[in-house]
């Protein structure tokens, strides 16, 4: 079995690295860390319009390129290497994968094209003040029937939650954990940016007070979808870390070549 990347995948890596070298320098990263939004909208638009990165794994029928998670892993490695400040993980890994795995054809048709084009910033809101990451930790209540519901409760540590135009929320109905789409500017939704240790990745507290929401997928089957998405997210985060570690190794090797100690090169 061959675990090496293909020529096409390495070419993708080369292209993405060149783009990020130009757009995500150390200076640019530090500048974006200090902004409220945490990213450069112009760069985000270029990622979608020129590079097609937001639509990389979105199926072609919804405006994407239809590549696999392997290609996404290559891109994420390079983003980790460059410490890119952008809502890519929240939009492409969390939200888009939730939609893709929801089995909801109407929701995919409605939301994925905007994500693929780089026009929609999206995120996934699951964690609550308890800090629990399992199914029992989801206690937010959803009231309603059919496809129309209202949500009340609080979500914490939502990646890019203060800037997302689409928020996919996990909440409970009488049938169990379900998934809902909420407009980022919906009435009754209060969004508060949080202070984070990793300033390249913004988070927010979201408070819902009878906020209108649209059911995604099958009512009561939300945790099945989330279990898959969380596994994919773990792989995606590991890819970012691999890229970051590779960059650190390269820097250490280069420094070792010029470092002199006690009158001799180390």
Regions found by a protein language model. Give the residues of each.
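A structural signal for short hydrophobic beta-strand segments in well-ordered beta-sheet cores
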Residues: 140-143
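Internal helix-loop-helix
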Residues: 48-109, 113-118, 159-166
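A short core secondary-structure module
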Residues: 125, 152-190
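A short, Trp-centered hydrophobic/proline-enriched beta-strand micro-motif
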Residues: 118-129
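Short secondary-structure junction/hinge motifs that connect adjacent elements
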Residues: 27-49
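Glycine-rich beta->alpha junctions and the first turn(s) of the following alpha-helix
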Residues: 2-8, 12, 81, 189-266
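Residue-level signal for inorganic ion chemistry
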Residues: 9, 20, 75, 104, ...
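Structural signature of FAD isoalloxazine-binding scaffolds in flavoprotein oxidoreductases
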Residues: 66-75, 134-138, 182-183
């Amino acid at each position: 079995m061959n675990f090496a990347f293909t020529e096409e995948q390495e070419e993708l890596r080369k292209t993405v690295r060149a783009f990020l070298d130009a757009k995500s320098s150390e200076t640019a990263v530090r500048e974006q860390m200090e902004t409220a939004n945490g990213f450069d909208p112009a760069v985000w638009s270029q990622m979608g319009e020129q590079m097609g990165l937001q639509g990389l794994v979105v199926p072609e029928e919804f405006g994407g390129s239809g590549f696999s998670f392997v290609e996404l892993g290559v891109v994420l490695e390079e983003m980790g290497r460059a410490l890119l400040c952008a809502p890519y993980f929240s939009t492409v890994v969390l939200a888009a994968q939730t939609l893709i795995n929801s089995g909801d054809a109407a929701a995919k048709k409605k939301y994925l094209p905007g994500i693929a084009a780089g026009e929609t910033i999206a995120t996934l809101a699951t964690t609550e003040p308890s800090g629990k990451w399992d199914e029992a930790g989801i206690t937010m209540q959803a009231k309603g029937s059919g496809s129309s519901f209202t949500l009340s409760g609080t979500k914490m540590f939502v990646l890019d939650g203060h800037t997302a135009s689409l928020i996919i929320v996990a909440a409970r109905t009488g049938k169990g954990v379900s998934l809902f789409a909420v407009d980022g500017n919906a009435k009754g939704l209060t969004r508060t940016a949080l202070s984070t240790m990793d300033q390249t990745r913004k988070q927010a507290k979201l408070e819902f007070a009878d906020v209108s929401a649209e059911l995604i997928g099958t009512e009561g089957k939300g945790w099945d979808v989330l279990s898959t998405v969380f596994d994919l997210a773990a792989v995606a985060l590991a890819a970012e870390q691999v890229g970051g570690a590779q960059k650190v190794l390269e820097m250490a090797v280069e420094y070792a070549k010029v470092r002199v100690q006690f009158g001799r090169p180390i």
